């Protein structure tokens, strides 16, 4: 509602894997970033641009977390976008972020032998998935997160910052400095990778976690269970970007 209150029309929808689970993959396709998220976003952009109430050249894509990571790909496959907004978008390989995330959360809650064994198993899986598509890949080791081979092949091949750098449209990257899932390291990679893009803008927020909730100290998963709206100053920044007032960011 924050953007709508600022006069910006918004279309939100459930990611198809959340809404339909395994049934979301079309016949003849495999689960990957496109079938999970990109295809639907591209279709929605096309539908929104066709609405008579809106100027077709005024449509932006805003993505959070995986949506932010995929925003450059969505833009590359869409026609006539005005810009993209990346909220807490991962810039590093997914397996690297997962390993860091699981070690972080385990350090907050449990250091038992059982948890250590689980982490060691995950580390082995993540190291192995980097070898997917090579002779060194071990078929006897399970793939992380229960995702299929097609998903990880796609994830390994996708380079979000490189894709974003080739776009000829405004980009706004926002990041919470207390985020342990997508970190300031990712923010730095976006910033350095888009250094030559004159229409790329960046802003980080000291108090915000991955869900853009305010807090202090080390962020924890328990924060997510408390309802907390995105702060007005973040909404103001997004609205300014959409209205072309980048000099105020």
Language model feature labels by segment:
Residues 180-186:
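Conserved alpha/beta-hydrolase "acid-adjacent" motif
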Residues 208-211, 216-249:
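Catalytic active-site module of serine/aspartate enzymes centered on a nucleophile-bearing elbow/loop
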Residues 83-166:
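Accessory cap/linker subdomain of secreted extracellular hydrolases
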């Amino acid at each position: 509602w924050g953007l709508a209150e600022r006069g910006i029309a918004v279309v939100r929808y459930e990611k198809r894997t959340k809404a339909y689970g395994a049934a979301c993959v079309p016949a003849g396709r495999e689960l990957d970033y496109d079938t999970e998220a990109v295809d639907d976003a591209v279709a929605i952009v096309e539908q929104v641009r066709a609405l008579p109430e809106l100027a077709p050249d005024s449509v932006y894509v805003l993505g959070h977390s995986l949506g932010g990571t995929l925003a450059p790909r969505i833009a590359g496959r869409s026609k006539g976008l005005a810009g993209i907004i990346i909220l807490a978008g991962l810039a590093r390989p997914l397996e690297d972020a997962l390993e860091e995330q699981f070690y972080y959360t385990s350090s907050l809650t449990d250091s038992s032998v059982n948890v250590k064994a689980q982490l060691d198993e995950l580390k082995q899986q993540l190291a192995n998935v980097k070898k997917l598509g090579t002779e060194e890949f071990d078929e006897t080791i399970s793939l992380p997160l229960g995702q299929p081979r097609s998903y990880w092949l796609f994830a390994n091949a996708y380079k979000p910052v490189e894709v974003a750098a080739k776009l000829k449209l405004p980009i706004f990257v926002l990041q919470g400095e207390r985020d342990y899932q997508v970190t300031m390291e990712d923010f730095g990679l976006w910033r350095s990778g888009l250094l030559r893009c004159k229409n790329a803008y960046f802003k980080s927020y000291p108090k915000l976690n991955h869900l853009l909730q305010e807090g202090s100290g080390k962020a924890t998963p328990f924060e997510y269970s408390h309802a907390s709206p995105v702060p007005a100053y973040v909404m103001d920044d997004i609205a300014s970007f959409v209205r072309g007032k980048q000099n105020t960011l």
